[in-house]
Amino acid sequence: MRSVKVSDYMTDYVMTFTADTDLFQAIGTMLERKISGAPVLDKEGNVIGILSEWDCLKRILHGSYYEEVGGTVGDYMQTEVLTISPNDDIVDVADNITKKGWRRSIPVMDNGKLVGILSCPDILKVIYDFDEHTGEGAHGRA
């Protein structure tokens, strides 16, 4: 597969949350915008975490058992965040995230600033587009 930059397939407009955003407000936003998660920023715009639908579901189910549902994004977000550059090769990124078992969208950073996000569907689109244009792989076969 040819080299494809992250910047060619990333989403430029990124929905973000702050740590003090109400959890159910964040869930409502994710459902409304049909996104699976979003980066969490501090007041200076630095990425301090990421909130995924999986984080929400896991924590809410656990919290409902103890009758402690609710809270803020900061209570539920994942603080270990994998970030990538717009110039990174998507195939290398895909290889890296599958080896690490990373299942969240990946913030794309340029000079310390959030410039986009790359999701699993974005990566799958690369594979689909490559297959469609070259006739190679299952998509292009008769």
Task: Enumerate the language-model features and the residues they cover.
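Tandem CBS (Bateman) regulatory domains
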Residues: 1-13, 52-83, 87-100, 114, ...
